[in-house]
């Protein structure tokens, strides 16, 4: 196949704007799968992707299409749409020459679309605006065209209107891809460079790398080098990606997309964004932009049954084979026993991983409240980073603390603007920009501490705006904050898993909210249980769970009052002893109550 007949493109869209359905339509229009074989969402392979309607891993498919009596190869590179996976998006887009910008005709441009379009523009991709779901009764094509032009600045007079559901406009869209998106620029004589834009683990073949060949070529049995690790491997097999079963090939030429089998044991050896080159004709430098995926959000994961600790370790090891962005290390908690402090790309990533651990490995887990990384500058000049509030040094040893900030982009119907600004101010947000896209919709940009977002910001945003606002964030920098550690004591015992780091001015109110929430959850005992919130040694709030009364005088019929008094005194003594040594078992809701406070 001549390089001039290859088109590499991806689809950019917000969740629920019909990206996976459109991909399926393009695949069936090109005849890669018969209608009978078509399962909805061919590109989404994980059950959890289909259930949540999201794309987590980038998938690819090679399609053949005849146009003007010439055969063309279309490589459709599917990208995740969610903010947590934006690094995977950037690598997928770097493998393309063009992108379809898909916008729902009834909903308009959303926040996550903007972030991904900017990545595409940075990579100088040819962008084709596609307005989807034109079959819906409330579709407003002209309004959506205006929004795309106003927010993103792309001319929409030639936008393609399609309905992925009914198939309207799909043929015209494929022909536009061929005529508008340029062929790959290649140099067959240059040393081989291949960009890994996805990798996953196969039980039979080991770690597989999905690559786009930029320069040169790779053939079966070649000795290749992974540039960031400097490790050498032999190419055992090469495939073209196909939705049903991959097609074997002897070589991959520049401009092509394919799967490379190197017989590796873990995906950590072929990380997304890395470069593969040949040992005999080594490239001088790697393709730019490679970063190791960084964890932003951390949470403790503990098995409810303490003897399942090793099972949890095995499960995390297996997930790590397929997702090199997870980080984890063992930790112990006085309240919860042995577990792991796990790092995630973001909140959705955390939910997906916890759900996969429970579903695929049959584990019952307690997750502590999510936290972020803090930079602690100590009075003795030492500098440390912590992810667990219980690691915070004593107050007298801290000079100052820095916390991570993110740039939050929100698009909301203007009727909810007042409520949203109140929420953002309460979350310590700083307004950077406010722009009316149309009289009914507003674009907001705020700098917000990441810690305020990981708790429950997304849920509150959705409930305040009846689900109409969309939200995206990207990390910017660490800034100094006036922060303190809030500890919770139950029956005099410090519950380390409930410690949180909060702004000083909110500590009092958060402490009060937390102890009153805990009071509702902690089960009543035969003795009184004090729940206290403290900063250092200072108690700032307290609630008491009253004891259950046992009627010790029930067996005294009538009789002497002194007899009853004696029994009551004895009970009082017993309760005193019990209180001193009593242990309170906290339910999972207690650990989640931290998330519910505002």
UniProtKB/Swiss-Prot annotation:
Record's protein name: Elongation factor 4
- Swiss-Prot/TrEMBL catalytic activity: GTP + H2O = GDP + phosphate + H(+)
Which InterPro entries does its entry note?
EF-4, EFG_III/V, EFG_V-like, EFTu-like_2, G_TR_CS, LepA_C_sf, LepA_CTD, LepA_IV
Q: Which Pfam families does the protein's record reference?
A: EFG_C, GTP_EFTU, GTP_EFTU_D2, LepA_C
Q: Which family does it belong to?
A: Belongs to the TRAFAC class translation factor GTPase superfamily. Classic translation factor GTPase family. LepA subfamily.
Location of this chain's protein in the cell? Cell inner membrane
Q: Name one GO molecular function term.
A: ribosome binding
**Which GO cellular component term is one of those annotated?**
plasma membrane
Q: Which enzyme type, at the first EC level?
A: hydrolase
Q: Which residues form the tr-type G domain?
A: 4-185
Tell me which residues bind GTP: 16-21, 132-135
Main localization category:
membrane
SUPFAM superfamilies xrefs:
EF-G C-terminal domain-like, P-loop containing nucleoside triphosphate hydrolases, Translation proteins
**What is the native source organism of this protein?**
Campylobacter jejuni (strain RM1221)
């Amino acid at each position: 196949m001549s390089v001039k007949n290859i088109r590499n493109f991806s689809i950019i869209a917000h969740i629920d704007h019909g990206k996976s359905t459109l991909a399926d339509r393009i695949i069936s229009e090109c005849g890669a799968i018969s209608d009978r074989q078509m399962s909805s969402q061919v590109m989404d392979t994980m059950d959890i992707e289909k259930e949540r309607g999201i794309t987590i891993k980038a998938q690819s498919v090679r399609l053949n299409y005849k146009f003007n009596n010439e055969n063309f190869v279309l490589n459709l590179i599917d990208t995740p749409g969610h903010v947590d996976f934006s690094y995977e998006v950037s690598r997928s887009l770097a493998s393309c020459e063009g992108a379809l910008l898909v916008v729902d005709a009834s909903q308009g441009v959303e926040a996550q679309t903007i972030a991904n379009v900017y990545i595409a523009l940075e990579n100088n991709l040819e962008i084709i605006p596609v307005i989807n779901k034109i079959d819906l009764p409330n579709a407003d094509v002209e309004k959506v065209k205006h929004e795309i032009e106003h927010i993103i600045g792309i001319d929409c007079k030639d936008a393609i209107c399609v309905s992925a559901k009914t198939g309207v406009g799909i043929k015209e869209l494929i022909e536009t891809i061929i005529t508008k998106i340029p062929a790959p620029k290649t140099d067959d004589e240059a040393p081989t460079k291949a960009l890994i834009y996805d990798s996953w683990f196969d039980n039979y073949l080991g770690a597989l790398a999905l690559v786009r060949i930029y320069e040169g070529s790779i053939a079966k049995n070649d000795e290749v080098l992974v540039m960031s690790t400097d490790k050498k491997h032999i190419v055992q097999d090469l495939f073209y990606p196909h939705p049903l079963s991959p097609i074997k090939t002897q070589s991959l030429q520049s401009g092509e997309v394919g799967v490379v089998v190197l017989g590796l044991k873990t995906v950590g050896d072929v990380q997304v964004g890395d470069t593969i080159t040949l040992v005999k004709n080594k490239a001088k430098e790697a393709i730019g932009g490679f970063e190791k995926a960084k964890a932003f959000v951390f949470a403790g994961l503990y098995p409810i049954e303490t003897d399942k600790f090793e099972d949890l370790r095995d499960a995390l090891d297996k997930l790590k084979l397929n997702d090199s962005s997870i980080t984890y290390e063992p930790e112990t908690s006085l309240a919860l026993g042995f577990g792991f402090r796990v790092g995630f790309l973001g909140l959705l990533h955390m939910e997906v991983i916890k759900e996969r651990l429970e579903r695929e490995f049959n584990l019952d887990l307690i997750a502590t409240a999510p936290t972020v990384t803090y930079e602690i500058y100590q009075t003795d000049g030492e500098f440390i980073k912590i992810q667990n509030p219980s690691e915070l040094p004593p107050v007298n040893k801290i000079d100052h603390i820095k916390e991570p900030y993110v740039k939050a982009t929100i698009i909301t119907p203007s009727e909810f603007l007042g409520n949203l600004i109140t929420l953002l101010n309460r979350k310590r947000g700083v307004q950077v920009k406010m722009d009316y896209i149309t009289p009914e919709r507003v674009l907001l940009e705020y700098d917000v501490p990441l810690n305020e977002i990981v708790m429950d910001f997304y849920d509150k945003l959705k409930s305040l705006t009846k689900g109409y606002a969309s939200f995206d964030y990207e990390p910017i920098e660490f800034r100094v904050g006036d922060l303190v550690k809030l500890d919770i004591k139950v029956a005099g015992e410090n519950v380390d898993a409930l410690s949180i780091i909060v702004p000083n001015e909110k500590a009092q109110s958060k402490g009060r909210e937390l102890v009153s929430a805990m009071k509702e959850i902690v089960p009543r005992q035969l003795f009184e249980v004090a729940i206290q919130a403290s900063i250092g040694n200072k108690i700032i709030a307290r609630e008491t769970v009253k004891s259950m009364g046992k009627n010790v005088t029930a067996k005294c019929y009538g009789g002497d009052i002194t007899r009853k008094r004696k029994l009551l005194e004895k009970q009082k003594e017993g309760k005193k002893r019990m209180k001193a040594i009593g242990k309170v078992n906290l339910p999972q809701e207690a650990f989640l109550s931290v998330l519910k406070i505002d």
